[in-house]
Amino acid sequence: MATTTDKQVSPTSPSFVYNLDHEDRNTSLKSGRAVLTDFNEQQFVKFDKGCSIETLLKERTSFIDQLLKKIWEHFFSKDECEQLTLVAVGGYGRGELQPYSDIDLLILGENFIELQPKIVEFITYLWDIGFEVGHAVRNLEDCIEAGREDVTTATNLLEARWLAGNYEQFLSLQNLFNLKSFWPSHEFFQAKLEEQEKRHKRYNDTLYQLEPNIKESPGGLRDIQTILWVAKRHFGASSLQELMQHNFISLQEYKEIQAAYLYLNRIRFALHRLKKRHEDRLLFDHQQQLAELLNHDDRPEHNDSIKAVEAFMKPYYQNAHIVARLNEILLQHFKEEIYHFAEDKIEPINPRFRIINNYLDVVKENLFAKNPTALLEIFIIIENYQHLIQGIRSRTIRLIRNHLHLIDDQFRSDPINKALFIEIFRQPKGVNAAVKRMYAYGILGAYLPSFKKITGLMQFNIFHAYTVDEHTILVIRNLRRFFIKQHAYEFPTAHQIATQLCKPEILLLAGLFHDIAKGRNGAHEKLGAVDAKAFSQKHNLNKNDTDLLSWLVLRHLDFSYVAQKKDLSDPEIIQQFAEKVGTQQRLDYLYLLTLADVRSTSDEVWNDWKNQLFLQLYHNTTQALDSSSSQPRDRVKQAIFNKEKASELLKKRGLIPMHFQGFWQAFEQTDFFNRQSAAEIARITRVLFEEDHEAINIHLQPTTSRGATELIIYMHDRDYLFAQFTQIIDKLDLNIVEAKIYSGEDDMTLVIIYLLNRESTSITDPMILTEIEETLKHQLFLKDDTMPPTQPEPRRIRVFEMPTHIQFQEINEELTELSISTKDIPGLLAKIGQAFKSCKIRVHDAKINTVGEKAEDTFMISSTTNESIHTRHSQEELKQALLNNIEQ
């Protein structure tokens, strides 16, 4: 028996036409839904068999045209059809319908009052059989008026296509629309340009986001459509082929953009087919499913599935890059044509380059062919003349792209070219603008083959929002911002350090090379350091600069690791880090590189808490490197130093030792005095002295110098307190970023916790602060240790599979450092706390670090008798309890 996929589904089939006229509306609707569903399934089968996307789109447009005409004829008599016109507009008008795309319709006429009920029935029927309908009912005058007021409406009319009804009315609409007074070419161009700029800004002006929108992101289908809209308004050209006839696009450019157009449409079709609904976002889970659907995943292992996603996304980024570059070239070309000056304003620069109407241009078209070095020289000119240059003329961009093949081994070995490349990074201004264009036009990838390998290389995790190459360009941008006075307010310390560097170019080159070895087998920081050293030697950098550059690439992960995972109040940890860094110069460069690196991963990664951690590590290490500093270098001296300073601060507030001596003595044997700063010790002491003591004392400091809300709990000692307060705070939907627990000799416990809300900011709302205090007091009194209900995993977290890694390191006879690396699931800390409780573990310190979908938490723990967890049996027991709770 034949199925719907074995024979051609047709809206003109007798059964559909018969059921359309059926007196039972349900029968009619059922038939309409069936013919639409069957057609979709038929197209999906063809798609899976490799049918071209061009054929599928044309077939879909033709099918929907026929279906709508039949439905139109059912609802309107011949006489009524003469009064109305059914017009396809928007994406449907240009014949670009995906399986679950909206269909945009215009019903045109002059007198709708009598026919209004039938129009409503017609549109309702379309909705009821499964169409998503966007429609407007207007007369000619209303159409033109609406189009004049809104460029989006005007653009929809630009793609109007007659379907049924009065054809003369449609021609009248076209004639009115084609009048030059209706959106003059230059006004339409400017409006579409502004529209595109706003759209790009919504996607951070980058096509290299890890979850792009196939349609709306830079380099997406909308960028191609913008070219065609402008071309149609200016030339009347309705296709890319016609643009070739007007000499606005070369044959090679046509082939590139047409191939990209078909590729993006194929991915979009696959996404609709996969999700069974309108969807244009390439979300992480979609990428995995599409990689499998499109045969990029024929290996079941976890690591290979990640490689399959990366293999699927790389051609997406390559095609989006082609679209973005050709969009830039063609819109610039249109601009030069549409805004043609009667007399060009020409300013010579040298025999090779000139500025025409504020746009940089070559003097002769054969410049790059005769003098390939000019491919680098042009970027020096961009830097030096940035105050006069708005951009590059379209023909010059084309010439750069067409001569990339000249950048070969001979070019790279030329002493002049090597010197020019370094000089680009040495310029006092315009480096970011130059490097962005070198990247966009393919110069960076051509000059540095290792950079070309990371172009379009995605990083399948939440921590990184961009591909490796785009992240690298953002790092260079953020490094440059440290030097600019107007941006000094963002990072005052970084600005002060940057402006005193002797060799800013080494810092920028470190940014260029820090991730250049990603995607290779091996530690990318080690492989990248080898690349950086080879580059330095080839480009004749002196030994000091070579050593500094390769060291920065090798150690670019160290600063962030120590800042976010180690106890920065421990002078021994600081001393160890200072010894690894070696000099203040290296520390300055490393701090700036790390700051720019982390800031360039994602907008969601950076917050005030991390900023303060970085500053604390920088300042503490600076003091450790200073041989004349009086800063203590061990824990005992640190505690004495902090107590003396805290006493001085308390004395200024009217408190003398007799007021707080008992409190201090109770915590003498803890790490309280060497792990809290003198200012913190003084403030905590004053808070506890001034407040009336209760069984459970809670104090909240909304904002602190640490960039987080401080929560102080002072109460009678209790086993498994960590398990209890982590559960309470998890119920309050807050994040713990650090917790310190001090058990005093007077049977009192002091807990200091630093909190952030889900937006990674301090908690300042008085109502929320009151709720936190009241909830904590109530729950701690109850000694409630029931696990909170587990929240579902967020969509972006759920897609990732991640093994849990647990490591133990004995610090001394009393303490063990426990490191847990796992997926950042909801309620993670509460689950860890429960495992501690079941294994009778006491927590002294917790440092919580979330990196995208990954949690990297460090705990200082002991037994309830204050002994380290050193036996293999006790470690294995705790490890198993943690795994059971985390992975259940």
Swiss-Prot record:
Belongs to the GlnD family. It catalyses: [protein-PII]-L-tyrosine + UTP = [protein-PII]-uridylyl-L-tyrosine + diphosphate; [protein-PII]-uridylyl-L-tyrosine + H2O = [protein-PII]-L-tyrosine + UMP + H(+). This is Bifunctional uridylyltransferase/uridylyl-removing enzyme. Its cofactor is Mg(2+). Residues 349-709 are annotated as: Uridylyl-removing. Residues 1-348 are annotated as: Uridylyltransferase. The keyword Repeat applies.
